[in-house]
Amino acid sequence: MDASFDTDARPAGNVPSVTLDAATARDVRGPSALLALDDEPPPRLIVDPPLAGPVAAGKVFIQYRTENLRVLPVFGAGAMDVSPRVGHVHITVDDATWHFIDASGETVVLVGLAPGPHRVLFELADPIHRVIDRQTVRFTIPE
């Protein structure tokens, strides 16, 4: 696509004529984030093992990332048609009957766990809390 500026429409200061071969915003960035896409690949959750140094001191730092989904604090049925997809992560420690939600996409920090083996369940969820993908991380806090 050509963008042309002719000499008859030039601003003050005698700016020369310019022709640019430019890609459209859609060519560079992809489809608008405001339109749902039927052919998006499925969302995926990737969870790293906790960092060994802090675990030895009783502190657990677990990083995660997602593919084909943005982690944002957006909830409800109205967010189901947003593209790229949005969602959040449910996090359950050991056999707790409750979980907490992370919508930041930042490193998860756990402190105050008793010495011994632990597991943390990460569940990638859509805006209406349906689980899309899950990963479990296991580690041991030393005595």
Q: Which residues does each PLM region occupy?
A:
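Short, compositionally biased P/S/T/A/G/V-rich stretches that sit at domain boundaries
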Residues: P16-V60
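Short amphipathic, basic-aromatic surface patches that mediate peripheral association
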Residues: D48-P50, R65-D81
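Short beta-strand elements bearing conserved aromatic residues within extracellular beta-rich modules
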Residues: V89-I91
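Short beta-strand segments within Ig-like beta-sandwich modules, predominantly Fibronectin type-III
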Residues: T97-G105, V111
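Surface-exposed, short loops/turns at beta-strand junctions within beta-sandwich domains
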Residues: L110-P117
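Beta-strand-rich extracellular modules
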Residues: E123-P127
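Short beta-strand edge segments in extracellular beta-sheet folds
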Residues: R138-P142
